[in-house]
Amino acid sequence: MRAIDAFVNVNMGSAERPDYLVRVAEDYFKRSEQIFKDIGLDEMLEIMDRSGVEKSILSLRAETPSEQVLSFCKARPDRFVLAAYVDPRRGMHAVRALERVRREYPVVLARIVPFMIDLPPTAPCCYPIYAKCIELDLPISVNTGIPGPPAPGKWQDPMYLDEICLFFPELKLIMAHGADPWWQLAIRLMLKYKNLYLMTSAYAPRYFPAELIHFMNTRGQDKIMFASDHPVLSMERCVKEAAELDLRDGVLDKFLYTNAERVLFPKSR
């Protein structure tokens, strides 16, 4: 069994800790000690090897990239690549920062988190980011579903992505952190748009709803990709629970590996 983990954090011990993140770690996930720790290179590689994870996509900020995170990619470029958080409210600063990190580092994904910017994905300031992602041939993830932290959840309704997919048909758009409680809507949108996908970061496989499992086994075999959000959820736990899902032959490998490989690591890039 092989896997690509599309959402991994290694510097949560030293990174800034906003109040909402502290509260969600303590009240929602109840594992603040495990979440707020830095993970060393050797430790992360051991976790990946035990889990069968060949590559991890590490998160960092586009405007202020962490040297700690970058050191993982420099040491083991065969095992680590990057996803860059972008704050669209920063206007052209954000656009130029995204272009810079894409040019200088192994960035394979951009990220926007609506609840963190208190804006919907349809906000005008987001559109230059989407256009730049198309220009750079860079997929982008947008958090969907009610967030665990005590922060506005309304901006993470997947319905906002209907307009984005329609306006930017060349954009590879990935819903991140599942889509609870809007699973049916998320599935319907993925059926409607070829350029829309979903990663299951921060959502334990044992809690996947029946409609998602059905979609993965049928028309959505090429749409759903694995991610843990380690250490928020343990990588080992998520891989183990994924292997226990009631999936048809060949679907588990697509979920754990092939879909992410195709969308995030195209051979032509």
What are the functions of these language-model segments?
Residues 7, 48, 69, 101, ...:
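Conserved, mostly hydrophobic/aromatic
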Residues 37-47, 90-102, 183:
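Short, acidic/polar
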Residues 11-13, 63-65, 89-92, 146-150, ...:
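Active-site environment of divalent metal-dependent phosphoester hydrolases
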Residues 47-54, 76, 136, 167-171:
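A structural motif corresponding to the C-terminal end of an alpha-helix
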Residues 108-109, 122-225:
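Catalytic pocket-lining loop regions of alpha/beta-barrel enzymes
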Residues 1-9, 16-51, 55, 221-223, ...:
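Mid-to-C-terminal alpha-helical segments outside catalytic/metal-binding sites
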Residues 3-12, 141-144, 175:
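Histidine-centered catalytic micro-motifs
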Residues 54-55, 63-148, 152-155, 192:
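Active-site gating/metal-coordination segments in enzymes
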